Amino acid sequence: MTKLSRINLYKLGAILELATGAALVVCPALVMQLLFGSPLGSGGDHVAQLYGLALLGLGVACWGDSCADQSQKGLMMYNSVAAIVLISFAVRGIAAGLMVWPAGLMHLALGSLMVWDRFSS
């Protein structure tokens, strides 16, 4: 993978996490409804907002042309594990939201590309 492709891969990951994080902070119930197809329980808004803040932090850590190696590893791990969890939830019927499959497959694609980038160089 060329340096420019690598920068764009991690920048795309950062943009997606920043957007998702901001959405979770501003309208957590809507995001969770789209992903899981069910309303949040008591305190769920607060947990979703806290998770949104963590995604904002991850996005900021990977923003720009100089995404540090440790930040790249963190983003790679997050995308890989998020793919497994979201797709597993969808397959088992735990999550039935409109966006669970697209989100799971997006994380799978990004995580796979990041793993390939990490171990092919």
Which residues does each PLM region occupy?
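Membrane-embedded alpha-helical segments of multi-pass transporters/permeases
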Residues: 25, 63, 87, 112-115
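Non-cytosolic membrane-interface motifs at loop->transmembrane helix junctions
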Residues: 38-45, 95-105
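Membrane-helix boundary connector in multi-pass membrane proteins
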Residues: 64-66, 73, 84-102, 118-120
